[in-house]
Structure formats: C-alpha cells, structure tokens
C-alpha cells in the first residue's frame, strides 16, 4: 500500500468531514434562530392579549365605580322579575323600587297621585273573638308608577286583643304615632275621589275604612278571570299571583301594605287591556246624544184638541 497515497486520501476525507460539519452547524444555527424567533413572537402575542384583558378589566371597574355600583343594586331586581312581565312594567318597577319609602308618612308631599291608585290595608284582631273580628291598623296607597302616595298607621276604636304581628307586621309601638280612624278616612277619601281604585279583594279594605267607592271605578285583581284560573275559579291569593305573573316574592314574613299595594298595581298594569275589556262588559260607555237643534232644548209638546161641545 502506498503510504503517500493513503495520506492524501485521508486529508481529502478530513476536508470533506469539516465541510459537512460546518454545513450542519450552520443549519442548526438557522433552526435555532427560527425557534427563538417563534418563541419571542408567541410571548409578544400573549403579553399583548394580557395587556388588553387588563385594560378592559380596569375600564369595567372604573365604570362600575362611576355609576355608584348600579349593577349590584339592580341585580336583585333582575332575579325578581319573571317571564310574563312587560318591558314597561320592568322599567317602572326598577325606577320605583329604588325610591325610598317613609313609613307612616301620611300624604306624600312629592308623589303625584294621577288617575289610578292601588290601596292595601293591614288588620289586627279585636274584641273577645279576634280570629273573626278585625279592625284597621294600617293603610297604604301607591300611584300608577308604584310610588307611595299615602301611608299611615291607624288607631282602632276597639280594644286590640291580637296584634297578628307575624302576619300584619303591626305591634304596640306603632300605635304611638298612629292617626285616628277619622283622620285616615278623610285623607283616603280625598285621594280616592274621582279616581280608579285598584285593589285585591278591595271591598274588605273599603269596609274596614267605612268608605264606599263607585263600582265602575274599581279594578279588583282577585276578580280578574285570567287570574282566577290559577285558583281553579276561586279567589287567588295575592302572594301566588305576584309569584306566578310577576316573579315577585312577597309576604314571606310579616306583610307590608306598601309592598302589597305595589304588587297589586303591577298585576293590573300587566293585563290592563284585558281588565278594561272585562270592565266594559259590566259598565259599557254611555253615549250621550245632543238633541238640541236651533236653540230648542225640548221637543214641542203637541196640544191636545178639546172635544167640541154639541
């Protein structure tokens, strides 16, 4: 074997290996550079997304603070409003619920009465048979929008033998600043005069007040046919109607006549057109025809002919 020739071949092999090694390392560097670039790009994208999320979160928080926590304040209302409430009813209820009511305020100095009012009363047991004998202890009236128009505790003339606090919410302490029955009668009569009265079994409330009201001006939710269906044709409870048709949870503990009056008005407003259709069946509109012509108020009476004397 030629040693010189072998040495020459060996050198060529080494040069070839060096070229291949250099080429391989160059490819590795390029691949590594691409991977590094990809990782950097991904990191930049992630950081951009995080920045956007963070800025959006801060913006929402600042908006919530500017509105004074409106979202949290309105959340309970969203839970209470249900499937069958109209948009108008929801918006009006949200607005009136936010307004504070003053217990035993008497006639509100700010609320406008309007054409429609809803009334509810709370009773206490009196006399030797308090389960059957009741007396008026509180009266509440709201307008069409659910704003409190009148609220007053009433001093019964009879001796109270059962406060019914767990139901009525009335206790002896409330009588300290209660108004007399005569004063409340006068106040309520002035409010109801010439207006449409909405109530639930409202005849009981009027009897307790010893007041009357024209039947054509009464809308009673306990007598509304679509609402009576839920009670199998009988008189439905206000609590059931409020839950089923308004999604409102009322009368869980002691009753509030203000709350009940508001629920009653909402029930009327929810189905107002049907209420008025039913009402027209009993009390059709009277059409007055003006028969006055040429200034004559009455028809000329025909003179009777006197029989001739023979």
UniProtKB/Swiss-Prot annotation:
Belongs to the REXO4 family. PANTHER family: RNA EXONUCLEASE 4, RNA EXONUCLEASE REXO1 / RECO3 FAMILY MEMBER-RELATED. Exoribonuclease involved in ribosome biosynthesis. Involved in the processing of ITS1, the internal transcribed spacer localized between the 18S and 5.8S rRNAs. Residues 1-107, 287-310 are annotated as: Disordered. Residues 44-53, 61-70, 94-105, 288-299 have a biased composition (Basic and acidic residues). Residues 115-277 form the Exonuclease domain. InterPro entries: Exonuclease_RNaseT/DNA_pol3, REX4_DEDDh_dom, REXO1/3/4-like, RNaseH-like_sf, RNaseH_sf. It holds the Pfam family RNase_T. It is found in: Nucleus. Residues 1-11, 83-93 have a biased composition (Polar residues). Residues 300-310 have a biased composition (Basic residues). This is RNA exonuclease 4. It is an enzyme of class 3 (hydrolase). Disulfide bonds: none annotated. GO terms for molecular function: 3'-5' exonuclease activity; exonuclease activity; nucleic acid binding. GO terms for biological process: RNA processing; rRNA processing. The lineage of its organism: Eukaryota, Fungi, Dikarya, Ascomycota, Pezizomycotina. Keywords: Exonuclease, Hydrolase, Nuclease, Nucleus, rRNA processing. Its main location: nucleus. Its EC number is 3.1.-.-. It comes from Aspergillus fumigatus (strain ATCC MYA-4609 / CBS 101355 / FGSC A1100 / Af293) (Neosartorya fumigata). One of its GO terms (cellular component) is nucleus.
């Amino acid at each position: 074997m030629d040693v010189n020739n072998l040495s020459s071949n060996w050198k060529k092999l080494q040069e070839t290996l060096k070229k291949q090694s250099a080429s391989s390392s160059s490819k590795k560097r390029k691949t590594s550079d691409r991977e590094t670039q990809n990782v950097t790009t991904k990191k930049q994208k992630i950081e951009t997304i995080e920045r956007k999320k963070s800025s959006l979160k801060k913006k929402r928080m600042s908006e919530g603070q500017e509105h004074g926590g409106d979202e949290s304040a309105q959340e309970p209302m969203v839970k209470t409003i249900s499937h069958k409430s109209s948009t108008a009813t929801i918006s009006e209820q949200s607005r009136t619920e936010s307004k504070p009511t003053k217990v035993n305020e008497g006639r509100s100095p700010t609320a406008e009465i309007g054409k429609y009012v809803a009334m509810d009363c709370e009773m206490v047991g009196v006399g030797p048979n308090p389960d059957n004998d009741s007396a008026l202890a509180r009266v509440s009236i709201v307008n069409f929008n659910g704003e409190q128009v009148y609220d007053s505790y009433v001093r019964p003339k009879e001796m109270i033998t059962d406060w019914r606090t767990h139901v009525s919410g009335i206790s002896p302490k409330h009588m300290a600043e209660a108004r007399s029955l005569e004063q409340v009668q006068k106040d309520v009569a002035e409010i109801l005069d010439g207006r449409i009265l909405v109530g639930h079994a409202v005849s009981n409330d009027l009897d307790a007040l010893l007041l009357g009201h024209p039947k054509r001006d009464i809308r009673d939710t306990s007598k509304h046919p679509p609402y009576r269906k839920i009670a199998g044709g009988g008189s439905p409870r206000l609590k059931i109607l409020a839950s089923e048709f308004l999604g409102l949870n009322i009368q869980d503990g002691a009753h509030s006549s203000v709350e009940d009056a508001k629920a009653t008005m909402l029930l009327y407003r929810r189905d107002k057109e049907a209420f008025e259709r039913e009402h027209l069946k009993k009390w059709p509109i009277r059409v007055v025809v003006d028969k006055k012509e040429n200034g004559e108020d009455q028809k000329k009476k025909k003179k009777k002919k006197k029989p001739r004397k023979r």
